Swiss-Prot record:
It is found in: Cytoplasm. It catalyses: NAD(+) + ATP = ADP + NADP(+) + H(+). NAD(+) binds at D68, G69, N142, D143, R153, K170, D172, T183, A184, Y185, N186, L187, S188, Q242. Keywords: ATP-binding, Cytoplasm, Kinase, NAD, NADP, Nucleotide-binding, Transferase. It holds the Pfam family NAD_kinase_C. Belongs to the NAD kinase family. The lineage of its organism: Bacteria, Pseudomonadati, Thermodesulfobacteriota, Desulfuromonadia, Desulfuromonadales. Its EC number is 2.7.1.23. Involved in the regulation of the intracellular balance of NAD and NADP, and is a key enzyme in the biosynthesis of NADP. Catalyzes specifically the phosphorylation on 2'-hydroxyl of the adenosine moiety of NAD to yield NADP. GO terms for molecular function: ATP binding; metal ion binding; NAD binding; NAD+ kinase activity. GO terms for biological process: NAD metabolic process; NADP biosynthetic process. This is NAD kinase. Its main location: cytoplasm.
């Protein structure tokens, strides 16, 4: 690996400081470093300043300095290129950014020697159809959420799995999550935690009107089709809680497994269930 891209949470002073140190460390080893323009400005180094979206196509490795939100944003930029991502946690929870600040340079040494393993994380593709035409398309690492606005009423959503009608959810919203996203909004809404190696997705209603409506796990080969049965309501679709669009009556949302995945470099010192236990504060035996 000779060409390294760095993304950081630029409004986080620690992230900018760590980025500056990492740039010096990498260049001291003869490696070429690529920075997004805002980060290059913040660290005072315009030598390799590039548009955010162009970096994944130019590098062999991406380092993300921040939290899970920063990494999720970068994952959409990578868009299926076979570029591994090393996530360094400078935030709070950090399910995806497994590497701690103290482990950063030891982990980098191992990665540059090729001594690392990858966790391939399934992604989703969500398409919004309006009057038979594509109105929006989103790549998703964590979840697709359909949610009501501040003063909207309960939403009616007719849901099918492939061609089979499932039910019409009457709820505050609906979450379609990957195994990676099962520890995000899905978990808060009472959905199950799913090991990232499993090939499935979970459909979780948000505050359903019917107590019998419960989260449903389906195969990752399924297409989830959601038809909006709205009555002049304020309803939005969000992808990973970061981008999205307003939905209208009659809109159809189709969600399926994407052709691409996100490749995360695993921590050399932690297993998934150790991370889970630590982050959720589960007790020891």
């Amino acid at each position: 690996m000779k060409r390294i891209g760095i993304y950081a949470k630029c409004n986080h002073p620690d992230a900018v400081m760590v980025a500056r140190d990492v740039v010096g460390w990498l260049r001291g080893r003869g490696l070429e470093v690529f920075l997004e323009k805002k980060l290059a400005q913040d660290v005072g180094d315009a030598e390799q300043s590039h548009d955010r979206g162009s970096i994944p196509g130019m590098v062999d490795l991406i380092i993300v300095l921040g939290g899970d939100g920063t990494l999720i944003s970068v994952a959409r930029q990578v868009c299926g290129r076979d570029v591994p991502i090393l996530g360094v946690n400078l935030g709070s929870l950090g399910f995806l950014t497994e590497i701690t600040r103290g482990e950063l340079y030891l982990s980098l040494e191992k990665v540059l020697k090729g001594e690392f393993s990858l966790s391939d994380r399934m992604m989703l593709e969500a398409v919004v159809w309006r009057h038979g035409l594509e109105a929006g398309r989103f790549s998703v690492l964590n979840d697709v959420v359909i949610n009501k606005g501040a003063i909207a009423r309960i939403i009616d959503m007719e849901v099918s799995v492939d061609t089979a009608y499932l039910t019409t959810f009457k709820s505050d919203g609906l979450i379609i999550a990957t195994p990676t996203g099962s520890t995000a909004y899905n978990l808060s809404a009472g959905g199950p935690i799913i090991s990232p190696g499993l090939h499935c997705l979970v459909v979780t209603p948000i505050c359903p009107h019917m107590l019998a409506n419960r989260p449903l796990i389906v195969s990752d080969t399924a297409c989830i089709r959601i038809e909006m049965k709205l009555r002049d309501q304020d309803v939005v679709l969000t992808a990973d809680g970061q981008v999205g669009m307003a939905l209208e009556a009659g809109d159809v949302v189709e969600i399926r497994k994407a052709d691409r995945c996100t490749r995360l470099i695993k921590s050399p010192s932690k297993e998934y269930f150790e991370v889970l236990r630590t982050k959720l504060g589960w007790g020891e035996r």
